[in-house]
A protein has these predicted regions:
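Catalytic core of membrane glycerolipid acyltransferases/transacylases, capturing the structured
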Residues: 1-33, 39-40
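Non-catalytic C-terminal accessory region of glycerolipid acyltransferases
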Residues: 35-176
């Protein structure tokens, strides 16, 4: 099955990305009034489609799990489907705002893990907090996996989280 990602509406107007996103049937989200995209996401999930939601609402500059919006748990609850959280670490080495893009065959390790399905209870805030807790735990596991395979993360590097003595902003700095 293909994933139908929710993405901010402005990207759908971009000359290259817009037509691609539309052709792949992704869902534009109006950040002021997202009710139409929420309804569409619930309809898709009820039909058995996979709906991809970046619950943080943006890319975290801290490379940690930042505060999350409750849309994913609300969509899943209304559709009667689970949330299957995904955690990624390493992609920031390929493309981070303000840094040189590192595309092509770079052999840069990128770790992705899918967590166990979580069935929302209907308490969107509590569900979102629990999903975030599980994602943070998984991210810390990816850090351990990275260090087990490649040694300690290099201190001061822009792509390394501050908590791991890296040069990325702290979670508080990134959210300010």
């Amino acid at each position: 099955r293909l994933v139908r990602f929710l993405a901010k509406a402005g990207i759908f107007k971009a000359p290259l990305a817009g037509p691609l996103l539309k052709a792949m049937h992704h869902v534009p989200v109006d950040r002021i009034d997202g009710s139409a995209s929420m309804r569409q996401a619930v309809r898709l999930a009820k039909k058995g489609e996979l709906v991809g939601v970046f619950s943080e609402g943006t890319i975290s500059r801290s490379f940690e799990i930042r505060s999350m919006k409750s849309g994913a748990s609300r969509i899943a609850y209304e559709a009667g489907v689970p949330v299957i959280p995904q955690v990624i670490f390493g992609s920031q080495r390929l493309w981070t705002k303000g840094h040189k893009k590192n595309l092509g065959r770079t052999k840069t390790p990128v770790f992705i893990t899918a967590l166990e399905p979580y069935y929302p209870t209907g308490d969107a805030e509590a569900d979102t907090a629990e999903i975030r807790r599980r994602m943070q735990e998984a991210l810390e596991g990816l850090w351990e996996q990275y260090e087990a395979e490649f040694g300690p993360m290099p201190a001061g590097e822009y792509w390394v989280p501050a908590r791991k003595v890296g040069g990325a902003p702290t979670l508080d700095e990134a959210e300010a």
